[in-house]
Design a protein with these regions (language model features):
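C-terminal output helix
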Residues: 90, 108-121, 125, 129-130
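The feature encodes the CheY-like receiver
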Residues: 60-61, 88
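Acidic catalytic/metal-coordinating carboxylates
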Residues: 37-40, 63-66
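Active-site beta3 strand of CheY-like receiver
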Residues: 48-54
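Short hydrophobic/Thr-rich beta-strand motif most characteristic of the beta2 strand and flanking loop
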Residues: 28-36, 44
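Conserved acidic segment of CheY-like receiver
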Residues: 2-15, 19-23
Length: 131
């Protein structure tokens, strides 16, 4: 894949750092910005226009599902991959209903995040079963 610009959204700074490390280990991938909640994610997505957004599902204030819906309304060409600590089938449904192109359980992040981002950038869904 060519150069990919990624917006990372999570309310925990340590998690954002880990995601940045994992994503930027891929050749040509760059985390172009970070956000700590859904409202900030919507603002940054409009300002930065990343190739893909990796977003936590559960955050204070505007959560990842609400932010994804808003991003899909304003910039539907930017795919979103949801990450979640809560690995239940209902979370997959919520992610799909919000317009996300992928959903990865945090326990599988190191194994599944890169394939999920690659799929999303190609505008292909990536919804493996959650535990």
């Amino acid at each position: 894949m060519n150069h990919i610009r990624i917006l990372v959204v999570d309310d925990h700074e340590v998690v954002r750092g880990l995601l940045r490390h994992l994503l930027e280990a891929e050749n040509g991938w760059e985390v172009c910005g970070e956000a700590s909640d859904g409202d900030e994610a919507v603002e940054r997505s409009r300002a930065l226009h990343p190739d893909v957004i990796v977003m936590d599902a559960v955050m204070p204030g505007c959560n990842g599902f609400e932010a994804t819906r808003e991003i899909m309304r304003s910039t539907p060409e930017i795919p979103v991959v949801i990450t979640t600590l809560y690995e239940y089938p209902e979370v997959l449904r919520q992610a799909q209903n919000a317009g996300a192109l992928g959903c990865v359980g945090k326990s599988n992040t190191t194994r599944l995040l890169i394939p999920a981002v690659k799929s999303a950038v190609g505008h292909h869904p990536f919804f493996p079963p959650l535990s």
